[in-house]
Amino acid sequence: MGLTSILIAQVLFLGAANSAVVKRWPCSVSPTGPTDPSVAKNCGYWVNDVAKNDQCADLEGYFDISREELVNWNPSLKENCRLQNGHSYCVAASDLTTRSTDSAEEASRMDMATGVEAADLPSPTQGGLAANCNAFYKVKTGDSCWSIINDFGNFSIYDFYRWNPSVGQSCEALYPDYYVCIGVQEQEPPVATPTNPPGPVLSGTPANCNKYHKVLSGDNCWAIANQYGISLDQFYSWNPAVKPTSCQSLLPDYYVCVGVAETPSATATPQPTPQPQQSSSPDQPMPQPILSRLLRILL
């Protein structure tokens, strides 16, 4: 093999390796393809449209998760970890485990601000940042949403996306030198709004809905369900218009249902209590006509 052939082979090899590193998959909070029949029920983030040559190691490296986590969330991969073409796989569930880092090393490379007042917010930040954010991290080149979560280890992927909706559902808009929210101040649960919707609602909203949420730019179905302490199944059942589109028809400035009034159970009408029939007894006086007739016969 000539020198030129060797160089071409090396370039092709490096190109293939680099393409594997930078590859992005379509991601969403709901699967778009077939899933593992035993997939984690609390899965909140999916990788979709897996290709024939994709490997488990590709997903693990890209999403910064371990083989144990990937298999735990997708049990069908346990035998040989072979991905199925066109399938969707869970890459984050609420039991997400995090790896600890050396505290000294972490402190030296973490550029963060905590306990800040509104007037002292770091800059720049992206739109939609959680209003009650009190801890920030300055994004560095090479960071990913997953690496930030694993570095701090005290919040989940769902929290991060809820606090930083502008980064996108697949972390495609995480920009270096911008500050992202990595912690919020505790606040009271959202207060129920009046029974009547205060604005436009999607079709299929149940008549007994008594709690609404106004959709904001950057909201997603999982984040809203998590905010109000309801399951994703409940959210979809109360807002059927968003389910067929995998939450893509969640429209800003519309109101979605996040709570319903309990329907009173039907109460059977009680049957009247039978009254005992009157019957003559030896102690009751004999009717007057009968008594008169007997006296005439005897006399």
UniProtKB/Swiss-Prot annotation:
Name of protein: Secreted LysM effector ldpB
PANTHER family referenced in this protein's UniProt entry, alphabetically: AM15, PEPTIDOGLYCAN-BINDING LYSIN DOMAIN
Major localisation: secreted
Observed phenotype of the null mutant: Has no significant effects on cell wall chitin content, cell wall integrity, fungal morphology and fungal growth. Does not affect survival in a mouse model of invasive pulmonary aspergillosis.
Organism superkingdom: Eukaryota
One Pfam family of this chain: LysM
Free-text domain note: The LysM (lysin motif) domains are small globular domains involved in binding chitin in eukaryotes. LcpB contains 3 LysM domains.
InterPro entries named in the record: LysM1-like (IPR052210), LysM_dom (IPR018392), LysM_dom_sf (IPR036779)
Species name: Aspergillus fumigatus (strain ATCC MYA-4609 / CBS 101355 / FGSC A1100 / Af293)
Gene3D superfamilies: LysM domain
One Gene Ontology term, aspect cellular component: extracellular region
One GO molecular-function entry: chitin binding
The entry's keywords: Cell wall, Chitin-binding, Extracellular matrix, Glycoprotein, Repeat, Secreted, Signal, Virulence
Functional note: Cell wall chitin of A.fumigatus recruits lung eosinophils during infection and ldpB might have a role in sequestration of chitin and act as triggers of host immunity to dampen host defense.
CDD domains referenced in this protein's UniProt entry, alphabetically: LysM (cd00118)
Glycosylation: residue positions: N154
